[in-house]
Amino acid sequence: MVFSNNDEGRINKKLPKELLLRIFSFLDIVTLCRCAQISKAWNILALDGSNWQRIDLFNFQTDVEGRVVENISKRCGGFLRKLSLRGCIGVGDSSLKTFAQNCRNIEHLNLNGCTKITDSTCYSLSRFCSKLKHLDLTSCVSITNSSLKGISEGCRNLEYLNLSWCDQITKDGIEALVRGCRGLKALLLRGCTQLEDEALKHIQNYCHELVSLNLQSCSRITDEGVVQICRGCHRLQALCLSGCSNLTDASLTALGLNCPRLQILEAARCSHLTDAGFTLLARNCHELEKMDLEECILITDSTLIQLSIHCPKLQALSLSHCELITDDGILHLSNSTCGHERLRVLELDNCLLITDVALEHLENCRGLERLELYDCQQVTRAGIKRMRAQLPHVKVHAYFAPVTPPTAVTGSGQRLCRCCVIL
């Protein structure tokens, strides 16, 4: 479209409303609000509900009160598909009831840290928001099993649910949830400390589409529960068991035999796991990309050898506090396909047997981006310097204890702390 110099009309008169709305749809909230102040015509365009399909209020969390959410819901109505109220501690049940009534097409709702909300909010969502697919209730500590019963009855399209740190949830709530929401693909239950193996049995029975499960710090879970999950959820790709300190190699065996698509395994602080379990896992789960084995204190270089042979896609590996790992294990890892092509992050802090020789081996890992070496007492500054000469892009985090100075005979000058070194 070409305009002559004599044209007096402004852009809002030259372009059709549909095209102007399309242009405005690319603007963020702040820019839309600024545009709304330009003129009456732009105010109408900027505040058109079709431009407010996705709203994230995290950056304004301290200023967001209930009335803000209510006004947004009235403005957006059925247009709104995605809303994040993460950290908006001033928002409560009453406002979210109004929101649910006005925004019945909402699909993605983040209420992480909205500590004022109770079961009442979940009842409202259940009643009015049947299209909800993604719901984050992290740290909504007043949520109980009643919420899960309501969600299961009214939000049957739910695919993602985060209940982390909702520590009133028990197996009864999980049973009610999964009976109604059988299409769940991701369920995050970090810090739900009352959950026991029976809860996992219910998940196994109904959630055959499950891809991601987080059980971090669910300390009552045992091998029996993990075995149940593995038998029913063969599509599992991401599993977090960190802090489930009762687990043994039986859990790894179940994963290896039943979950060949596994890509992410977090098993930090599972101190009973051994090389035998990880050997079977590695030989069957060739898609593994990320593993957190921090404080798996019984594993040795044998685990690294098996991962090197069978897991060519490995990108991130944490071996922090695995004190039996040596330079030889790092040699096998560095010479493997994953070492040459995929490895990006390696955490070796508090691996006391690691020396500068391991750093020489890691020079083969051309894609390495981050290396953690805190409290590796046999690693030297010189060794790190030599490695970084070959891998200049890698970020190395290391700690060197300061040399104890001799006792001053006279006077005492101010000293600088030079303990922590980020290289």
UniProtKB/Swiss-Prot annotation:
The keyword ATP-binding does not apply. One of its GO terms (biological process) is SCF-dependent proteasomal ubiquitin-dependent protein catabolic process. LRR repeats lie at residues 61-87, 88-113, 114-139, 140-165, 166-191, 192-217, 218-243, 244-269, 270-295, 296-321, 322-350, 351-375, 376-401. A lipid is attached at residue 420 (S-geranylgeranyl cysteine). Keywords: Calcium, Calmodulin-binding, Isopeptide bond, Leucine-rich repeat, Lipoprotein, Membrane, Phosphoprotein, Prenylation, Repeat, Ubl conjugation, Ubl conjugation pathway. GO terms for cellular component: cytoplasm; membrane; SCF ubiquitin ligase complex. A motif (CAAX motif) lies at residues 420-423. This is F-box/LRR-repeat protein 2. It comes from Pongo abelii. The gene is FBXL2.
